[in-house]
Regions:
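Non-catalytic structural scaffold of enzyme domains
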Residues: 1-235
Length: 235
């Protein structure tokens, strides 16, 4: 570990999303032998409070407190740079609070911003795309997590006509991705597709799967010929 910079992953939001990000790192690393892989540390903390509940005022406990503890654990374990396996956790109210807690602890850990790297990745890989569909949680929409950054980049964000399909796909107690992620239920997959259809009908040229659990339901690279953006791949 001391010879190579270790990558930290803060997971647990839900747990499968962190595992998925770790798998992506392995899959995208070009190697010829085991020893060529990048040291990776996954800290999966299911005690991190729900991000959307906090953002919508249903909870007063900022998830950034628990997130900072997890990131500090990663740093103590040898991580020099870390990613957070949750889109909604990157809202300013949570992400900035997390960074402030790290600063108080005199941490030198570099924490990547998932939304920023995703927008940069879209501009680099799909330079002609201007109309960008966003699929995410209510917290992601309410706090314009992607909207503001896309608009700043000269892109037009598009949202589904209704958020209920995605909320059910993610949170349903029986068929939702959080309850049933391996494998994801066909009910959840179809609900995600219905939301994708809505932004495609508005003219989306690419669609962001803006919740780290959505790529678990839809691992395909395209849908009806439209590129699906998995932010974890840009992280």
């Amino acid at each position: 570990m001391s010879e190579q910079t270790a990558i930290g992953i803060l997971g647990g939001m839900g747990p499968q999303a962190g595992i998925d990000l770790a798998s992506k790192i392995v899959a995208q690393t070009k190697v010829k032998r085991d020893q060529d892989h990048i040291p990776t540390i996954l800290y999966s903390d299911p005690l991190i409070p729900d991000r959307t509940h906090f953002l919508l005022g249903d909870s007063t406990v900022n998830p950034g407190n628990e997130m900072a503890k997890g990131l500090l654990n990663l740093e103590r374990s040898g991580a020099k740079v870390a990613g957070i396996a949750c889109n909604t956790a990157h809202s300013a109210l949570i992400f900035d609070h997390t960074l402030s807690q790290l600063k108080k602890a005199h941490s030198s850990l570099e924490v990547l911003h998932l939304i920023d790297v995703t927008v940069e990745g879209i501009r680099a890989r799909h330079p002609s795309a201007k109309r960008i569909g966003i699929l995410g949680t209510k917290g992601t929409y309410h706090f314009r997590l992607y909207d503001d950054r896309l608009e700043a980049a000269g892109l037009l964000p598009l949202r589904p006509d209704t958020f209920e399909h995605l909320e059910e796909a993610i949170y349903h107690s029986d068929s939702g991705i959080k309850a049933c992620s391996s494998p994801v239920s066909d009910v959840a997959r179809q609900l995600v597709f219905r939301s994708a259809d809505q932004v495609i009908q508005q003219g989306a040229e690419v669609v962001i799967l803006g919740c780290t659990e959505l790529p678990l339901a839809v691992p395909e690279a395209t849908y009806k010929g439209i590129p699906l953006i998995d932010p974890g791949l840009f992280m």
